[in-house]
Amino acid sequence: ILNKKIWGVYEHHPLHNKLPIIRGFDDKFYVPHSRNTGVDGEAIRKNKELTIVAESDETGPYIILNSTGSQVFVTGHPEYDPDTLDKEYHRDLAKGGDCVMPKNYYKNDDVNDEILVKWRSHAYLLFSNWLNYYVYQNTPYNLDDLLKMKTTNK
């Protein structure tokens, strides 16, 4: 558990440009985060079964793959709608207490200004790559073959 909540829209960068999961990603891309827990990047790096594919200097590992590519772990929220962090911010304000505005989210860091949606194209590309390269292309046409694959991989 972190001392301070990570939330806002953060810059990320790919670490392994040749992997299909990040095909087409920009050198820098943005992803929303909203969490009170950290991710131990050093522990992940020491695990030979896992690879950090993309990360942020501020939030740590973002996309992590297992060695076979059958598991993809994403620590941010690329699926967020444009107003998700705004709703969360106003909800937390209504509860009272110490509430900090989400980072890099509102234009000019002004809650009354527009929301800057910088993650949409990245989100579509991430989900498209995952479905195409890790689900569709790895699922056999004959579903009986899929059952055989599952029983032999145990």
Model-derived features with residue positions:
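Catalytic helix-loop patch of NAD(P)-dependent Rossmann-fold dehydrogenases
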Residues: 4
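Amide-donor transfer/coupling interface in amidating biosynthetic enzymes
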Residues: 7-154
